[in-house]
Amino acid sequence: MVFKPREMAKALLLMTGALAVSTVTSAEVDLAVLERGKEVSALCIACHMESGSGSSIEGFEYRPRLTGMDPTYMVHQIQSFKDGTRINHSMKPFADLLTDEQMHDVSHYYASLPAVKAEDYEVNASEDVLARGKDLIYNGDWNRYIPACVACHGVDAYGIGTSFPNLNGQNPAYVKKAINDWKEETRTNDPLELMARVAKRLTEEDIYAVAAYLASQPAVKEE
């Protein structure tokens, strides 16, 4: 099935209306949950760093920033590694170790930390590339049935609700891989297949530009 512009717009409104619930703050979470989550995070530190900022092995693997994310979104991602709707051979063994309670606790722990960018990447894109990425993020390209990223991911793409994460301050190589995973259907855990449909319409140049622009932005929205 192919969404036409009007149909896709309706789908976007449905998803953002149904899923844009308020993010759980650390103040609303029992301290015992955060303590247990911190203990579980010992499994995550080697790849995602103690700060949750993420890390990378150039040309091999790119580990995302975990902070600044809705905890329910995080739980869904871990569960997806377990059930195979998101494939990553490094993550699956760790995901398989976690109980439902541990997934809940570690996700809330990372959600309670300050959102910080990894320091092991640089954005070397030209101004033209960054401008192209920004245009797609804010305006999309309806001639190709590509909605703006902010239509789902909220103001300045800093995330909204439990299904649309904060996209900013991630390693551009990680963002490129994530989009290509949807294109190649090695990741199928997005609601209504919205990301898969969008990803398949993006060119490699589009993906590079979007990833570069997002990586150039701060991990948390500046006031």
Locations of the language-model features?
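Bacterial N-terminal signal peptides
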Residues: K10-S22
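Gly/Gly-Pro-rich "capping" loops immediately C-terminal to redox-active cysteine motifs
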Residues: K38, G52-F81, K92-L97, V150, ...
